[in-house]
């Protein structure tokens, strides 16, 4: 079975939550809970409130996501 295509959305980090999770507001106005991707953790890329990020989400659960890029 092939993997489902991930949905990618730009957003802004609104709040830092425990356990390396974040509340992210997407450009379309929705707020989701997102965690950092493994490569970002490995390379110690810091994400702070107010950062512009790219979030990928599965089409099955649109309330959770993964931050895979922090814009400069």
Swiss-Prot record:
<dbReference type="InterPro" id="IPR003029">
    <property type="entry name" value="S1_domain"/>
</dbReference>
<keyword id="KW-0694">RNA-binding</keyword>
<dbReference type="Pfam" id="PF01176">
    <property type="entry name" value="eIF-1a"/>
</dbReference>
<dbReference type="GO" id="GO:0005829">
    <property type="term" value="C:cytosol"/>
</dbReference>
<dbReference type="InterPro" id="IPR006196">
    <property type="entry name" value="RNA-binding_domain_S1_IF1"/>
</dbReference>
<dbReference type="GO" id="GO:0043022">
    <property type="term" value="F:ribosome binding"/>
</dbReference>
<comment type="function">
    <text>One of the essential components for the initiation of protein synthesis. Stabilizes the binding of IF-2 and IF-3 on the 30S subunit to which N-formylmethionyl-tRNA(fMet) subsequently binds. Helps modulate mRNA selection, yielding the 30S pre-initiation complex (PIC). Upon addition of the 50S ribosomal subunit IF-1, IF-2 and IF-3 are released leaving the mature 70S translation initiation complex.</text>
</comment>
<dbReference type="InterPro" id="IPR012340">
    <property type="entry name" value="NA-bd_OB-fold"/>
</dbReference>
<comment type="similarity">
    <text>Belongs to the IF-1 family.</text>
</comment>
<comment type="subunit">
    <text>Component of the 30S ribosomal translation pre-initiation complex which assembles on the 30S ribosome in the order IF-2 and IF-3, IF-1 and N-formylmethionyl-tRNA(fMet); mRNA recruitment can occur at any time during PIC assembly.</text>
</comment>
<keyword id="KW-0396">Initiation factor</keyword>
<feature type="domain" description="S1-like">
    <location>
        <begin position="1"/>
        <end position="72"/>
    </location>
</feature>
<dbReference type="InterPro" id="IPR004368">
    <property type="entry name" value="TIF_IF1"/>
</dbReference>
<keyword id="KW-0648">Protein biosynthesis</keyword>
<keyword id="KW-0963">Cytoplasm</keyword>
<dbReference type="GO" id="GO:0019843">
    <property type="term" value="F:rRNA binding"/>
</dbReference>
<keyword id="KW-0699">rRNA-binding</keyword>
<dbReference type="GO" id="GO:0003743">
    <property type="term" value="F:translation initiation factor activity"/>
</dbReference>
<protein>
    <recommendedName>
        <fullName>Translation initiation factor IF-1</fullName>
    </recommendedName>
</protein>
